[in-house]
């Protein structure tokens, strides 16, 4: 069906990655497990984007383990325009932050910034900003940012060990999902207008 093929090349494709999964729980705090929260928000983002006629590819839709290289391959093989990896934080601090590659272009930075701005309108404890590289080294990127071929970012949706962040996450799950989706669409309208029918 050539029509479908043509249609797909003219439609934005977004890969949503629910961090961790399966044998990899991610962070844990007082019985709360990161892999469960990331899947909840990822499925909600998928649902919202599909309601906006955006083509969505998921790295996982259930509690399974994929290596980071496999997550990148899923996005790359789908020729996704954006790759958004959803996580929860842990440690000292509170609020939401995004991470991009230290060589990220304007589009990836805009994606990360737009996500924070949209989440801020819903309500987050603190906007911790867009960060580059990784915690240990500003020039050493997280694998999902390093090995994906498209504009990408990691979103750390509050700290698992901070009650206020957990409450915000639970009470605003669908609103957070819509905010992330709207930020992706807003970025695409600027940088991928042809795929948005503009």
Predicted stretch roles:
Residues 36-198:
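Active-site-proximal helix/loop segments of hydrolytic enzymes
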Residues 25-40:
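Glycine- and acidic-residue-enriched helix-capping/strand-helix junction motifs
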Residues 4-6, 29, 161:
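Polar low-complexity intrinsically disordered regions enriched in Ser/Thr and small residues
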Residues 11-14, 96:
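Nucleotide donor/acceptor-binding cores
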Residues 1-12:
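Non-catalytic propeptide/linker segments at domain boundaries
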Residues 14-28:
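Short, surface-exposed beta-strand segments enriched in small/polar/acidic residues
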């Amino acid at each position: 069906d050539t029509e479908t093929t043509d249609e797909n090349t003219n439609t934005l494709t977004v890969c949503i990655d629910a961090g961790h999964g399966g044998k990899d729980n991610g962070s844990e705090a007082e019985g709360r497990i990161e892999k469960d929260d990331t899947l909840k928000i990822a499925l909600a983002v998928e649902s919202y984007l599909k309601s906006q006629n955006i083509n969505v590819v998921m790295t996982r839709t259930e509690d399974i383990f994929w290596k980071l290289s496999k997550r990148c391959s899923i996005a790359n093989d789908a020729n996704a325009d954006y790759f958004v990896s959803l996580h929860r934080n842990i440690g000292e601090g509170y609020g939401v932050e995004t991470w991009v590659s230290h060589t990220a272009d304007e589009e990836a930075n805009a994606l990360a910034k737009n996500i924070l701005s949209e989440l801020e309108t819903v309500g987050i404890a603190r906007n911790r900003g867009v960060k580059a590289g990784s915690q240990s080294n500003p020039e050493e990127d997280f694998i999902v940012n390093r090995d994906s071929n498209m504009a990408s970012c990691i979103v750390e949706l509050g700290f698992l060990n901070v009650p206020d962040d957990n409450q915000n996450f639970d009470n605003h799950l669908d609103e957070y999902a819509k905010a992330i989706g709207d930020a992706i669409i807003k970025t695409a309208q600027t940088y991928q207008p042809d795929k948005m029918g503009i």
